[in-house]
Curated annotation (Swiss-Prot):
Coiled coil segments of this chain: none
A GO term from the CC aspect: acetyl-CoA carboxylase complex
Gene3D superfamilies: 2-enoyl-CoA Hydratase, Chain A, domain 1
UniProt GO molecular function: acetyl-CoA carboxylase activity; ATP binding; carboxyl- or carbamoyltransferase activity; zinc ion binding
Domain CoA carboxyltransferase N-terminal per the UniProt entry, residue ranges: 29-291
Name recorded for this polypeptide: Acetyl-coenzyme A carboxylase carboxyl transferase subunit beta
Pathway given in the UniProt record: Lipid metabolism; malonyl-CoA biosynthesis; malonyl-CoA from acetyl-CoA: step 1/1
Compartment(s) where it occurs, according to its Swiss-Prot or TrEMBL record: Cytoplasm
Organism, as annotated: Bacillus licheniformis (strain ATCC 14580 / DSM 13 / JCM 2505 / CCUG 7422 / NBRC 12200 / NCIMB 9375 / NCTC 10341 / NRRL NRS-1264 / Gibson 46)
């Protein structure tokens, strides 16, 4: 009897493998906000222009999403979409990485260029996509942007650039750095002919892109919270041996120090751009605002 009391009884339960305990949730159906960590349905986030419904954080948009949110329906005509990078320096693994990004993004390069209308006003646009090689600027990216500027110059319409880039593409070395001068020179020629340049810096805009065409707009705008700068925060702090402000290199910091004209919420971007374009079409006449 005592033996029965102190003997261990086998528990009656079924063991469930860890893998079967997981819920089968399709990849991409949910998105976590990088700021407040709230988990949202991706389709609802996309409907809200990829702005967090809880904290207002602006998540990254790809080029196609941005074009759809800004240009009038059916007005966008893409050009130079078949241009693709090669491997001039024979950098190991570069071609394989390019192909992987092409398959992932359905793009041939890190920038989409074309022409269309915003609230009825024509413009040539270039939209960078950070999901392709982190939006880095190589020879083809620089060439596509330069050709877009020349197209705007030829058709005498404004040029709008949306930047999202980690900087120059290291796999192309000096050829990549040359694009800084080429794009800047093209903008200079366009500006000398009274061409309107609008630069919209989105997260992130860094390195050689921030140090060239991204900062050369007649209007320099940015999205809230965008990281904008040349060198990284840690490198700067180690160089100057000082601690930088918490909001250093954010869009709001740059606006406060006179390096931006405005920080524009994504929901207001189309209206803001449309207003700027219409103002320049009317020679500064603001009567259209009353209509």
């Amino acid at each position: 009897m005592l033996k029965d009391i102190f003997s261990k009884k086998k528990k009656k339960y079924a063991s469930v493998p860890a893998e079967s305990a997981k819920q089968d949730v399709p990849e991409g159906i949910m998105t976590k906000c990088p700021d407040c960590k709230k988990i949202m349905l991706t389709k609802e986030l996309d409907k809200n222009l990829r702005v967090c419904m809880n904290c207002g954080y602006h998540l990254q948009m790809n080029a196609k999403q941005r074009i759809k949110s800004l240009l009038d329906d059916g007005s966008f005509e893409e050009f130079n979409q078949d241009m693709m990078s090669e491997n001039p320096l024979e950098f190991p693994g570069y071609l394989e990485k390019l192909q992987k990004d092409r398959e992932k993004t359905s793009l041939n390069e890190a920038v989409v260029t074309g022409k269309g209308t915003i609230d009825g006003s024509p413009a040539v646009v270039a939209v960078m996509d950070s999901s392709f090689r982190m939006g880095s600027m190589g020879s083809v990216v620089g060439e596509k942007i330069t050709l877009a500027i020349e197209k705007a110059r030829e058709e005498k319409v404004p040029f709008i650039i949306f930047t999202a880039s980690g900087g120059a593409r290291m796999q192309e070395g000096l050829l990549s750095l040359m694009q800084m001068a080429k794009t800047s020179s093209a903008l200079k020629l366009f500006s000398e002919e009274q061409g309107l340049i609008i630069s919209v810096m989105t997260h992130p805009t860094t390195g050689g892109v921030s140090a060239s065409f991204a900062s050369l707009g007649d209007y320099n705008l940015a999205e809230p919270g965008a990281l904008i700068g040349f060198a990284g925060r840690r490198i700067i702090e180690q160089t100057i041996r000082e601690e930088l402000p918490e909001d250093f290199q954010t869009a709001e910091f740059l606006l406060k120090h006179g390096q931006l004209d405005s920080v524009v919420h994504r929901a207001d971007m189309k209206k803001t751009l449309g207003s700027i374009l219409k103002m320049h079409q009317t020679g500064g006449d603001l009567e259209w605002l009353e209509n």
